[in-house]
Amino acid sequence: MPSLVRRFQHASTEEQPFELNIQMESPPLVMYGNPDVSSGALASGLAKLTVFPADLKCESIVMEFVRIISTKRPLRDSCPDCKAQVEAFEKWEFSKEPTVYTHGTHTWPFTFIIPGHFPQTTNSPFINVTYILKTRVKIPSQPDFVFEYPLNLKRSIVTNADKIAQRLFPPTSLIALLELPPVIHPLSCVPVEFQLTGVKPENSKVGWRLTKISWRIEEQIKAQINGCSTHTGTKKPYIFKETRLLGNNEHKSGWKEDGDRIIFEIPISTSLLSKPICDVSFDGQFSLYIAHQLILETIVVEVMNSHPINSNARILRMKVNLPLTERGGLGVSWDEECPPMFNSVGPSPPAYEQVARSSPTDIPLPPPSCPTNVQRD
């Protein structure tokens, strides 16, 4: 199976007669499972240096895997440590000593594992999380050349069993039941089965009629921005809270009544223009919490003999946590991949020693056979 190849390069100029290229050979970087149980993502690729007609002398070539957590609202605008937290986790020294590279392409392979507890790449209104491969090339009598290749790290939670949520509404006899997928994905439409039981209680002339069902998906963002180690305590941390509407709809018909219960399948989805952000949670100098909820509201009217009673209506509201993650693809993490099995391959050919010992002269020949149908004169 051919590998997935992604390239990103920096074009050369007349003052800089070389080109840097990062070729990723690993599949998309997806961490499967929650942060406390995920095994992370495996990244591998090639770093390529293409030198044009003139030889290139480099003092060193170093590449690092860097995570940058930045904010748009720092406590101190003039302090770079208050604006961003930069950490390097992996380092490759492709060239430690001064080396002359001739015309052509020079490659260095690299591979590393991104821990599963790392937050995925996130772009929120308050805090951003980015990952890059940062390559630094030192050339004599010239400023250092820095090349940054962005990495898109995702998280996916793969589960098969649906989630069931139940809610009682005392003092009425109504019971609401929701059966929905355990997670949803951005820009996807998923079915949610809604059941409302107790609309026609036994031995009672009073019942309930469903008039409207409405739903909405909300995204809750909570962020706390602290100062760096130098400015901690000089100002109070900034705390931000925001609730965004990702999708909503309402229905006034379409459900089915089956005796004492009402059944309705509701398609829910996020809007194309909402730009949802996947669930994420981490603490530290920059703390961020993003979660999603499905809010379902139904309006029921009390009736007697199919006639309303003094317009006695009730609003029944349910809130269910609805995690939003990226699609899982094959859903197999790097540590669960099994090597190919070749059960159909036959035994290996004989060794050369056995062939040399059994030469053709050692093989006995069968005795000659005499013809039996020869007539003599």
Curated annotation (Swiss-Prot):
GO terms for cellular component: clathrin-coated vesicle; cytoplasm; cytosol; nucleus. One of its GO terms (molecular function) is ubiquitin protein ligase binding. It holds the Pfam family LDB19. GO terms for biological process: clathrin-dependent endocytosis; ubiquitin-dependent endocytosis. Residues 345-377 are annotated as: Disordered. This is Uncharacterized protein C1F12.05. It comes from Schizosaccharomyces pombe (strain 972 / ATCC 24843) (Fission yeast).
